[in-house]
Amino acid sequence: KLTSLVHRRVNLTQLGNDRIINVLSAIKIYPKSKSFIIIDLGTATTLDIVINYKYFGGVILPGRTTSYENLISLASGIKNMKFSNNTNILGKNTSQALMSGFNIGYKLMIESYLKLIKTTYKRNFKVIFTGGYASTIINKKTKFIYREDLTLLGTSFYQNFLNEKH
């Protein structure tokens, strides 16, 4: 039963399907892990927390590109700037400073949320990244998992779950 995956204080009907699917996928792919932080970096940036196989809640933020496009549409001095993967800490001009903020700033935001969640819940979480921007946040040296196909696999798991009910 899908509701058995959700903490009693969470309203499943008010949770996006993509997030439900990612949680289901993580539990199916990594059944030996009990607690997860699933970070989906796409149009929106979402962090979803699973403790003892139960969805506890999450965070939704504008995605990196969504924020960037919104800023350049509203700030007259940066309308014609192109998005790049500049990783310098400080920019020497407006364009470089903007890229430092979006690239390093988003990475630091994610790292800070991870630290806060781990400190608050005192768990050993399996951290799973997915979404189009995820590959630029993590590198091969990190202990995090990158599953480009997490949502796609979850969709298949969810469809199988629905078929089993009938």
Predicted segments, located by residue:
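Nucleotide/phosphate-binding catalytic cleft detector across ATP-hydrolyzing
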Residues: 1-36, 52-166
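Gly/Ser/Thr-rich loops at beta-strand to alpha-helix junctions
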Residues: 43-45, 135
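Short beta-strand scaffold segments in enzyme catalytic cores
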Residues: 38, 45-50
